[in-house]
């Protein structure tokens, strides 16, 4: 009897997960075609909004930022002027990162790989539509 139950358990689990996905899709369709425009969202973090994109959902955070120009030039002119004032700086350190210092490039890439793995935390939002229906979305 127990083996019969174990054989049906994966099928039951798949069926239930499919029903949950269908109900979530039905609730999202209930918000209407202008889902991204007519939407209030209540999230644990401030100023989170959902917008629709051709590729799917996009979670945006905060207000749009202004593009601020920095003192660095595209050609690396600022790096050249600062390294000229340091007399005992080796020529390898004066080169831009793209040309020299392959060991430093490896350190930076490995640090990005390590930090990228542990950054993902589950994030949930309750999305409230204009008609009062709500959907809980988790990443």
From Swiss-Prot:
Q: What is its main location?
A: secreted
Per the record, the domain of life is Eukaryota
GO molecular function terms noted in the UniProt entry: hormone activity; insulin-like growth factor receptor binding; signaling receptor binding
Propeptide residue span(s): 59-114
> Mind listing the GO biological process terms from this record?
cell-cell signaling; positive regulation of chorionic trophoblast cell proliferation
The entry's note on the tissues where this protein occurs is:
Expressed in placenta, uterus and in fetal perichondrium. Expression levels were increased in both early placentas and molar pregnancies and were reduced in choriocarcinoma cells.
**Where is the protein found, in the record's own terms?**
Secreted
Instruction: For this UniProt record, give its keywords in alphabetical order, as a comma-separated list.
Output: Cleavage on pair of basic residues, Disulfide bond, Hormone, Secreted, Signal
| Residues making up the signal peptide according to the UniProt record | 1-25
Disulfide bond as a keyword? yes
- Cellular compartments per GO CC: extracellular space
Which Cys pairs does UniProt list as disulfide-bonded?
A: 31-125, 43-138, 124-129
Q: What does this protein do?
A: May play an important role in trophoblast development and in the regulation of bone formation.
Q: Report the family membership.
A: Belongs to the insulin family.
What is the name of this protein? Early placenta insulin-like peptide
Mind giving the lineage of the organism this protein is from? Eukaryota, Metazoa, Chordata, Craniata, Vertebrata
